[in-house]
Amino acid sequence: MRTVLTNSNIIAQRFGPILGRMLFAALFIPAGVHKIIDFSTVSGYMTSKGLPMVDVLLVLTIIIELGGGLMLLLGWHARLAALTIALFLIPVTVIFHPYWNIEDAQQMMTQQHMFMKNMAIIGGLLCMTGLGSGKFSLKAAKFS
């Protein structure tokens, strides 16, 4: 049994970081692409939330989601990308999922779920910030 646990730990340490980076990339890269494709609709939604300079904020959002997602996928400055996305998600979560202001019970539950999901994503990104990109990354690659 001890051998199985040791082997599981080795596999998790070797492949966990790249699988985690791939899953984060699968979330943020399509989100950034969607915002490019549907720029005006997303801009209108951001305007409805009372945000100023929505086009500038939307371009920054695209850069963070798409650029950060690609950086995570490749393992290129993954700690910086993870920290940037985590810090970006804090105000995004508070602004776009304020479940405490919603009276309709169903909408409140939905927004609370979205809020907590984002908090979990922030937690995972902070773990990645601390642990780094792992073995299979551009950082770990040896180019000679």
Can you name each region flagged by the protein language model?
Residues 1-37, 47, 54-63, 67, ...:
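Extended, low-polarity transmembrane helix blocks
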